[in-house]
């Protein structure tokens, strides 16, 4: 594969970031391909609804926990009981079916919204012990965010890992030959809205570290330029418009700079520019094409794809430039670093692959076809990417341990370039 041809072809705080009207519209909704047989069993009892509720809060929580790959929720038809509070939980009923943790709760309409209350119950003690509980009000339009909040708290209490169910994804939808949309939705595909529409290609969205901006590639001026789009105001700024093509933007961890690729000197090289624009500085200067930069969490290192050795391969180099070390093996590209800096997620052999940066061990995560553009959840637990299904590009989800796989089927378009947001809540 030639890199140059690849480059040219190719609740609360949350609502403050987005000026567009958010509805329950969804382009894509998670559909399970492969569940997890060895994950921790958990029971999420249907939440008691005190009045009409527009969403099944308990099911949303169960789906979130399942999607992480860490839990296997008990099917509702196999629940031995449906308690509404910890006081109603009979520990023996649950331990008899191998369940140590039970989530119960209620949803009650309030003025203009709902009160969501939950308890996480440990059934290993008798009577059952409450491990975590909470109650909070959410606007009616944010009922799914209320469910995701419960999921985050339950997930963190059990795993000691911060939950990422209130995050979002950005992606590009292509319909026909001259209709492109940059869309943003909840991580599970719900509450989608359009950021920008164009008759020219849109590519490679990337989030700023605070989740308030998206950098992406647009051809609206008949050339590939990198723009930064403020999601609160809707304003846009061109930050990279060198001669030739500009693409593959990546925000630095502090949000002050953007690394990108440009072929202004003939071959592709990595440049760094201020997040508000300015004069770019050139980072690579080797023979061959260099593209797809990705920052290490501490901002000291850039991972990128280069064909300097004859075929695409992931390399690593210090931000000051200089020598680069091969990291991914021949045929690897599209690398992203996990937020803890321990793993590299990339494409190799057209599959999503995880590489342990300490040991060098690799693991194939996906089992789909012609995979591209992996993006990691901020807690490192899940990976979203695009793949080819028939004649369509679709979004796929896989847990970072490879045990849970799902697709997000979309209708009426090609779904490409997914990008997972950072945490959007404190």
Swiss-Prot record:
Alphabetized Gene3D superfamilies for the sequence: TolB, C-terminal domain, TolB, N-terminal domain
Primary role: Part of the Tol-Pal system, which plays a role in outer membrane invagination during cell division and is important for maintaining outer membrane integrity.
One BP term from GO: protein import
Signal peptide segment: 1-24
Subcellular location: Periplasm
Keyword hit for Cell cycle: yes
A GO CC term assigned to this protein in UniProt: periplasmic space
Family of this protein: Belongs to the TolB family.
SUPFAM superfamilies (UniProt xref): TolB, N-terminal domain, Tricorn protease N-terminal domain
Protein name per Swiss-Prot or TrEMBL: Tol-Pal system protein TolB
Primary gene name: tolB
Principal location class: periplasm
Organism whose genome encodes this protein: Actinobacillus pleuropneumoniae serotype 3 (strain JL03)
């Amino acid at each position: 594969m030639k890199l140059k041809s690849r480059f040219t072809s190719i609740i609360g705080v949350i609502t403050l970031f987005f000026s567009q009207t958010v509805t329950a519209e969804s382009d894509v909704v998670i559909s399970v391909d492969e569940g997890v047989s060895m994950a921790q069993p958990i029971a999420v009892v249907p939440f008691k609804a005190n009045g009409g509720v527009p969403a099944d809060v308990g099911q949303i929580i169960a789906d979130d926990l399942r999607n992480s790959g860490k839990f296997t929720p008990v099917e509702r038809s196999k629940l031995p009981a449906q308690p509404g509070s910890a006081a109603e939980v009979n520990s023996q009923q649950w331990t008899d079916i191998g369940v140590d943790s039970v989530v119960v709760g209620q949803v009650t309409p309030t003025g203009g919204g709902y009160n969501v209350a939950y308890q996480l119950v440990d059934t290993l003690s008798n009577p059952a012990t409450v491990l975590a509980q909470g109650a909070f009000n959410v606007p009616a339009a944010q009922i799914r965010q209320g469910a995701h909040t419960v999921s985050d708290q339950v997930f963190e209490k059990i795993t000691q890992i911060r939950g990422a169910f209130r995050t979002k994804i950005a992606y590009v939808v292509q319909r026909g030959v001259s209709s492109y949309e940059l869309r943003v939705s909840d991580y599970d595909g719900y509450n989608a809205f359009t950021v920008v529409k164009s008759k020219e290609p849109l590519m490679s969205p990337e989030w700023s570290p605070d989740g308030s901006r998206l950098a992406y590639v647009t051809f609206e001026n008949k050339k590939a330029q990198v723009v930064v789009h403020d999601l609160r105001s809707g304003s846009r700024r061109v930050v990279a418009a060198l001669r030739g093509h500009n693409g593959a933007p990546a925000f630095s961890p502090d949000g002050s700079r953007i690394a990108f690729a440009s072929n202004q000197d003939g071959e592709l090289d990595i440049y760094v520019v201020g997040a508000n624009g300015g004069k770019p500085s050139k980072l690579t200067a080797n023979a061959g094409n260099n593209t797809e930069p990705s920052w290490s969490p501490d901002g000291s290192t850039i991972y990128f794809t280069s064909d300097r050795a004859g075929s695409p391969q992931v390399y690593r180099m210090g931000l000051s430039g200089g020598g680069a070390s091969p990291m991914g093996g021949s045929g690897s590209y599209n690398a992203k670093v996990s937020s803890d800096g321990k793993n590299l997620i990339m494409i190799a052999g057209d599959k999503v692959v995880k590489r342990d940066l300490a040991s060098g061990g690799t693991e194939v995560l996906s089992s789909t076809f012609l995979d591209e553009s992996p993006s990691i959840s901020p807690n490192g637990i899940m990976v979203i990417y695009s793949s080819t299904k028939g004649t369509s590009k679709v979004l796929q989800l896989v847990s970072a341990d490879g045990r849970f796989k799902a697709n997000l089927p979309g209708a009426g378009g090609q779904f490409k370039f997914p990008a997972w947001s950072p945490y959007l809540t404190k």
